């Protein structure tokens, strides 16, 4: 759950809302006013960022690995090729940041010559992600780990039925003997040290709990342990782009202080670029709409990229972190 402090602070700094509460104004009207104020604040920040720090990405250049998601990436040939292999280049294309996480993860594996039938991989917080079936067709073996069926709020993403019947969820044929699904805590990986060539996780570690993202850090320490020397960790997580704090999502400070700077043998393969392009800033969408994405009319999804999200006054998107074990 996103931090409620931003909501409380917004109320306390808006006398009109406080007055409405004191006079017992209709709660739905109060919520509506609050949302308008929070939306205004978020869009003011976007306007400031676009004017003060304009940034455009060249879709024809070789993509960097460690960075924020950009709308322009869907025009990059390398990324489009991977999306095509994942059968995600629909016509017209529907743009979703989850596609980007998977494509960038595969791109990193290719760059480091790990996408082959000699490499073993582990997915932490795997759920029932479609990328698992793609990787099972390209790697020696993939282990998908998650708390399947244990947490009600994640039952749709990590159903207990995936444990025994992953084939039911496969979008295309895959090597069934190359995928093993295990119920396992991402902060306590039940494997010997130096077992895997690849460890990957897509928008999961931020949900592992603990103060100062302790759960995410413990998961990364376990990844550090089970990776072989020169193995790679491909991690997508959520990053706040404005000056806000949250107990789950990282921001531009805590992604270093609570994660990157605390690791020992895992090192970023290149500097992290936390700039966001102007075109990506234009895609901002409220989180309630995004949460209902699968039920939204196709025509809306075709014209509204799901990349940058707003929850209250918090603006966040996906960030890719690629590490190598030294």
What are these regions (language model features)?
Residues 184-199:
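A short acidic, Gly/Pro-enriched loop at the edge of an enzyme's catalytic core
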Residues 115-127:
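Conserved class I S-adenosyl-L-methionine
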Residues 57-116:
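Class I SAM-dependent methyltransferase Rossmann-like catalytic core
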Residues 244-279:
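Conserved Class I S-adenosyl-L-methionine
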Residues 122, 129-188:
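Class I SAM-dependent methyltransferase SAM/SAH-binding core
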Residues 1-56, 291-299, 314:
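Membrane-proximal basic amphipathic "stem/tether" segments
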Residues 214-229:
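A short glycine-rich, Lys/Arg-flanked "PGG" loop and its adjoining helix->strand segment in the class I
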Residues 230-238:
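Conserved beta-strand signature within the Rossmann-like core of class I S-adenosyl-L-methionine
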